[in-house]
């Protein structure tokens, strides 16, 4: 067979494979779309910082979340060298929005809650007084709380509820014994629930946590197929960069 014949055959084979893959994905999407979605009472959509292609940890991001169907807006919390709380995922460089500015902005928006994603706990005791100052103390909670942050959170922010961030092993996401060990870990930490990556989500996990009175928050779900897939599991919260898409699905 000469090269002139090989190339068209190779292209045709590749297109056939791609076509099969697309057909399979469309079929799975239809299956999830046709499945009835039953969400727990109080289900929420969290707009991840930087949602709707805005700048992360900006007031614009908060505004975009509010305007596109989110019940909760999320931003990252870091502290400057002198202990000022600011919105940043990494060590501050001096141009960040301050936590005070964010709380003041949120205080002007009714019914929106705030997910404060803790990146460091250096001066955590400064958060609650600012929340009181701007009358948003009953609207904030922490995520990003790793094992090593728990004691600092309890000591310096005892008034603020938090989710424990847990790296759930994908290979064990349906293993009852393993899942119960995570339940015990979350309970012992004092957290209200678990916050974890959608790739490790399972119906078994959600059900076991709910049976034990704990909340389930799943991040970060951005495409429509995964939204349907995770909604079917009935968690308490889904975090997304596309709150507009998710809110349209559940309406």
Question: For each predicted feature, which ranges?
Answer:
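Phosphate-group recognition and catalysis centered on beta-loop-alpha active-site segments
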Residues: 2-251
């Amino acid at each position: 067979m000469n090269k002139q014949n090989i190339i068209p055959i190779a292209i045709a084979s590749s297109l056939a494979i791609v076509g099969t893959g697309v057909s399979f994905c469309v079929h799975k999407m239809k299956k999830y779309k046709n499945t009835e979605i039953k969400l727990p009472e109080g289900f929420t959509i969290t707009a991840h910082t930087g949602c709707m292609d805005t700048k992360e940890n900006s007031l614009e991001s908060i505004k975009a979340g509010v305007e596109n169907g989110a019940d909760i807006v999320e931003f990252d919390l870091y502290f400057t060298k002198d202990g000022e709380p600011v919105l940043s995922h990494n060590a501050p460089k001096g141009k960040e929005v301050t936590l005070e500015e964010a709380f003041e902005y949120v205080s002007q928006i009714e019914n929106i809650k705030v997910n404060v994603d803790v990146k460091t706990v250096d001066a955590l005791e400064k958060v609650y007084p600012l929340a009181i100052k701007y009358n948003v103390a009953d609207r904030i909670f922490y995520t990003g709380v790793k094992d090593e942050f728990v004691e600092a959170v309890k000591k310096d922010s005892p008034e603020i509820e938090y989710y424990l961030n847990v790296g759930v092993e994908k290979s064990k996401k349906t293993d009852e014994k393993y899942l119960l060990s995570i339940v015990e870990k979350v309970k012992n930490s004092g957290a209200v629930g678990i916050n974890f990556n959608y790739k490790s989500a399972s119906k078994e996990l959600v059900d076991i946590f709910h049976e034990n009175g704990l909340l389930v928050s799943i991040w970060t779900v951005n495409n429509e197929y995964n939204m349907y897939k995770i909604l079917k599991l009935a968690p308490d919260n889904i975090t997304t960069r596309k709150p507009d898409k998710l809110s349209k699905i559940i309406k």
